[in-house]
Amino acid sequence: MWIERQAESLVRRMARQFPAVLVTGARQSGKTSLLRHLYPRASYLSLDLPAHAEAARSAPEALLAGYPEPVIIDEVQYAPSLLRHIKARIDGKRAPGRYFLTGSQVFSLMQGVSESLAGRCGVLNLHTLSRAELLGAGHGIGEQRYLYLGGYPELHVGADPDLWFPSYVATYLERDVRNVLRITDLPEFNRFLRACALRTSQVLNYSDLARDTGIAPNTARKWLSLLQASAVVALVEPYFGNRTKRLIKAPKLVVLDTGLAAFLAGFRSERELAASSLAGAFWESHVFGEIARQAANRGDTTPILYWRTASGPEVDLVIERSAGSLVAIECKWKEHPDSSDVAGLRALESAEGKRVKERMIVCRTKASYKLGDGTWAVSVADALKRLAAR
């Protein structure tokens, strides 16, 4: 059963404008399925197969000639030199919708695209399924269940999460680590994955992360860079205003799919996660993820930031609009926030003044309502509607 992706219209728009479209994202996020659903008559080449990747490196022109256009080329990071040959073909015939590329190593791919396909390629980052996409497809999944299960498509068409997640980590994450970083101590890397999951939505401290894993801080940086490049984690950068001097400058670490984070952290039921001390952090990661998904699916590259002073006041998420106005968002794992939950929002408003145009507490409320100071307590769905309207 096909679950409609919110990114479908953006892919079609890009294909009408650019000769090439690149869809990046975590492994198994649905990149190939999306393209094959939209373009069922396109020929298909997977560089995930070693023989095809070797042919792309050693005889690229012969390989490309064997696949009629339009063509979907999967996991193009295994032969980045192929991008130069695609560029040459595009320059010889500047027609839209010729090449559809996917890749699971974002940084290396973007470097190749900027060098070879600048101005010729539309780029979309595809996240795992949002809860909104699942609800739109008739999956009546509650927020607590989604928090535990996450959005990898296979899990919503019958896969057993107790079997799927261990296989995913072993097949994809560990393989990428072996191929890219030549790591041989996989149990050590698995401890690192667990440590990251336990720190989701926390300010990143490489020394603490390294110490708890038993590795050097530089190794922690290298491994985290790989997870970021693989779209497994995101680093949420701090917002620096003009009036506050002493701000936390380190980024926050967010595991982008809460289901993967729950598995890595050792939770084995949604009730266990909901009752744990980490529920609030997972909720914040969920809210960040839903906002990031909506933005990516719309082609919106506005950064999602956070704000925290050295003395304590914090705002979980800050979005700066093009005109310089700010949307300040707190994430609370509760149904009924009250005036005691707005301290961070008021501190940011005190620091930034009239630039703060909207304050929201995103919570588990069934119906949005306004607190006495003008802050709105809203559901995730309502928050997404408010952000989309601006």
Give short role names for the model-derived ranges.
Residues P19, P68-P70, A95-F100:
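Loop/turn-to-beta-strand initiation segments
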Residues A42-P70:
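Short glycine-rich substrate-engagement loop in P-loop NTPases that contacts/grips substrate
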Residues Y67-L82:
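Conserved P-loop NTPase "ATPase switch" module shared by AAA+ and STAND
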Residues L83-F107, S114-S116:
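Conserved catalytic/switch belt of AAA+ P-loop NTPases
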Residues T102-V106, G112, T128-L129, V362-T365:
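A short beta-strand-to-loop transition that corresponds to the Sensor-1 phosphate-sensing loop
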Residues F107-G122, H139:
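Short regulatory helix/loop adjacent to the ATP-binding pocket of P-loop NTPases
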Residues H127-F282, H286-N297, T302-P303, T309:
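Interdomain hinge/linker elements that couple catalytic modules in large macromolecular machines
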